[in-house]
Amino acid sequence: RSELKKKFKNYTLIGEVWEDVTTKESYGTKRKYALGKGLDSAMNYPLKVNVTDYLLGNQSAKDMKTFLISQQCNYPKPLYYALMNLLSSHDIPRIRTTLATGMNENLPSREQQAEYVITSKMDQKGKALTRLAMAVQFFVPGMPCIYYGDEYGMHGLMDPFNRGAFFENDKETYQEVLRLTSLRNREKVLQTGYALYMAPTENVLAILRFISEKKDVF
């Protein structure tokens, strides 16, 4: 990070960290990724894990709220508001496939994945839940990052099945993504506004974004 800033002062270094950036440990050593020591921000894999667990019914809205608040409390604001919020990548199954199949962990072998068939009913479930996941992705602080093809409902389990040729399939989901991106680009409160998380019932998560006295978090 120091070397990058010497040459490119306004460049941002985003790290591939799969856990909480402020508490990450590996090989018995606590990593100094946050507080300006190593990274400007990171890929937000924990968001993907918790969103899918919530939408698949593996955790409650209260659990999801607790996770979101923990990130908000643990991360310095510049890092928090620059998180790369992703739902899919080349290292994990596509979000629509995860939500359609319910396979968030314990995936079958590569041979079994190659033969796996997602039915129309499963796909419709995945479609509906993916749109909810994307709503969370766009409404929490950070930078929404869409893995190519997710905007058109592409499927894929683990590599290489999540790296398929791009095709325009689900136009409804594409239009929903256009609405979300337009809304976020238009409303500054979704970019740098304050965030408040609530769980009024066991299944309902509420995300409130607001600006206080005409000032955002910065």
Question: What name fits each language-model region?
Answer:
Residues R1-L83, V136, G153-R179, E187, ...:
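Active-site-proximal helices and loops of the catalytic beta/alpha 8
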Residues I14-G15, P144-Y148, K188-Y194:
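Acidic/polar loop patches that form or flank catalytic/metal-binding clefts of enzymes
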Residues L68-M158, L205:
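Substrate-binding clefts and catalytic carboxylate motifs of secreted carbohydrate-active enzymes
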Residues R94, P141, R184-Q191:
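Alpha-helix capping/termination and helix-coil
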Residues Y194-M198, E202-N203:
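Short, solvent-exposed loop/turn elements at beta->coil junctions and helix N-caps
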Residues K215-F218:
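Short, well-ordered beta-strand segments enriched in hydrophobic/aromatic residues
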